[in-house]
Amino acid sequence: MALNSLSLSLQFGKFPDAALHRAALPRHSVARWIRHALQSDAEITVRIVGAEEGQALNRDYRAKDYATNVLTFDYTQAPYVTADLVLCAPVVAKEAQDNQKTLQAHYAHLLVHGTLHAQGYDHETGEEDAEEMEALEIEILAGLGFDNPYR
């Protein structure tokens, strides 16, 4: 299977335990995970942030005053995907621990999830859409060697 091209910018904000998150996110892995979720060529920025920045972005752009695991800012979907994916490191780490997943497996899931959002998939528009998106995530992650993230 030929994968779509990806121009990737990987950024890390300043936050406690940043080195742990950098180690879990080698650039080649992040690119591989995203490329497997792409249905067209893309330019994507991935930014890993601390709780304060994550909360500010969620508050400012979604009117929800808490840090969330992943935010997707999609600018174009066709013929070329352009998007920013912002992942909040402390939230991702807590969720991984709570769900007994490795940090890397949870990041892979959230990057696939965010990449699908960037292409127009939305699990919040109805049960059928949620099932379609989850099925795609499970299939993509299985192809990457990760377990079903919803178990």
Curated annotation (Swiss-Prot):
One GO MF term attached to the UniProt entry: RNA endonuclease activity
Parts forming coiled coils: none
Cellular component aspect of the GO annotation: cytoplasm
InterPro entries, per the entry: MetalPrtase_cat_dom_sf_prd, YbeY, YbeY_CS
GO BP annotations, alphabetical order: rRNA processing
Role noted for this protein: Single strand-specific metallo-endoribonuclease involved in late-stage 70S ribosome quality control and in maturation of the 3' terminus of the 16S rRNA.
Full protein name: Endoribonuclease YbeY
Organism: Polaromonas naphthalenivorans (strain CJ2)
Gene from which the chain derives: ybeY
